[in-house]
Amino acid sequence: IAAYATAWQTCCSALKPITMSGLPDFLRSHTYPVLPAGISAAVLAAIAAFVVGLILMRLSGIAASISTLAALFILNVVYSNWDKVTMGTASIVGLPTYVTPWIAFAVAGLAMVIAYIFQKSSWGLALRATREDEVAARASGISVYWMRLAAFTLSGLVMGMAGVLHAHFLGTISVDTFFRRLTFITLTMLVVGGMRSLSGAVLGVVVISFVTDILRRMESGVSVSAQE
């Protein structure tokens, strides 16, 4: 959501009337600076997470997981067929590529700081209580529904920031960019590192990224002395 939102705002205004004619006039006819575009796109992702979370956070366990995955598939179908707004399955190109690895590292560090502060706050403690023992959390006066909704919305904001960075790092996006491959790689990172701690999530990212990079290099063959 955030990647497409920033693309609508920063893509060349000469191309949008042709390739994305269904956009509102204030998006179709104008190009906005990358910083306000990125911030507004991340906020839009948080709002979308809040709206979807109003329904999903009433579920728990495997039902919540399946419903969240179903929401991803529904969004993919909508974006894949919304030709006049998202260009369907085609790629949106010409985005300004202002994101460098150092900028990405800085924002990733900011995301970890936000997660750490939330983890150590009273809200983080209450959220962990809803995970460990939902009945006891309710008995303690914790609103399980609203705590989970707040965490889901905050996650939407952080993932929106990631989508903006991804779009302006590659300079092009498509619906396939954010579908099955990226989803399952992200889940794999969490499973490998551990989903119950911030350090585990970071470790999972490092390990899977390292393994992925090694395997990508091996695709072209491994050099042994002067021969491959």
Question: Model features per residue range: what roles?
Answer:
Residues 1-228:
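Transmembrane alpha-helices and adjacent helix-loop boundaries
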